[in-house]
Amino acid sequence: MKLIVGLGNPGREYELTRHNIGFMAIDELAKRWNISLNEQKFKGLFGAGFVNGEKVILLKPLTYMNLSGESIRPLMDYYKIDVEDFVVLYDDLDIPVGKLRLRMKGSAGGHNGVKSTISHLGTQEFQRIRMGIDRPKNGMKVVDYVLGRFTSEEIPDVNHSIEKAADACEEWLNKPFLQIMNTFNS
């Protein structure tokens, strides 16, 4: 069984914001794999299905970004999901829009959703797909930037990165994450 989590904030006002690119990737996977995200438990919205013979759970925590671990840990405990069968997708300011970076482990890098996940799991050793949103320009505050929407010029690159993140997740169902890293980080 695999758990794929996208980080974001709940509510219409946060839809399609930079901070919600993880949610957008989960929506793409749900559409691609015909999984309904209609169960609300564990402080999140989730759905399950079978993909290439593997049971997959998709989760969008509804706790707000900074408390994401409060949703992830109880679901992992309930379904007895090992940390190596878990991947999290989230926005990253240090990566250009449209680009991905896959990592096996690491610090939160200033991302509060990842910080909460590390805190609740008790480890930094979990797989991540970091989705580029770039840094704010012209002295814009980071909080305003991440809670802002992508520009019309960025949308094609955003859509491409969402598709590539979904492709990486799909390959991960049948291949080691390290192999997927080598493919998608090149």
From Swiss-Prot:
Family note: Belongs to the PTH family.
Transmembrane annotation, as ranges: none
InterPro entries hit by this protein: Pept_tRNA_hydro, Pept_tRNA_hydro_CS, Pept_tRNA_hydro_sf
GO biological process: protein quality control for misfolded or incompletely synthesized proteins; rescue of stalled ribosome
Keyword terms of this UniProt record: Cytoplasm, Hydrolase, RNA-binding, tRNA-binding
Organism, scientific name: Bacillus anthracis
Complex and partners: Monomer.
Short name of any one Pfam family annotated for the protein: Pept_tRNA_hydro
EC annotation from Swiss-Prot or TrEMBL: 3.1.1.29
Function: Hydrolyzes ribosome-free peptidyl-tRNAs (with 1 or more amino acids incorporated), which drop off the ribosome during protein synthesis, or as a result of ribosome stalling.
Keyword Hydrolase among record annotations: yes
Record: active site: H19
Listed name of the protein: Peptidyl-tRNA hydrolase
Annotated catalysed reactions: an N-acyl-L-alpha-aminoacyl-tRNA + H2O = an N-acyl-L-amino acid + a tRNA + H(+)
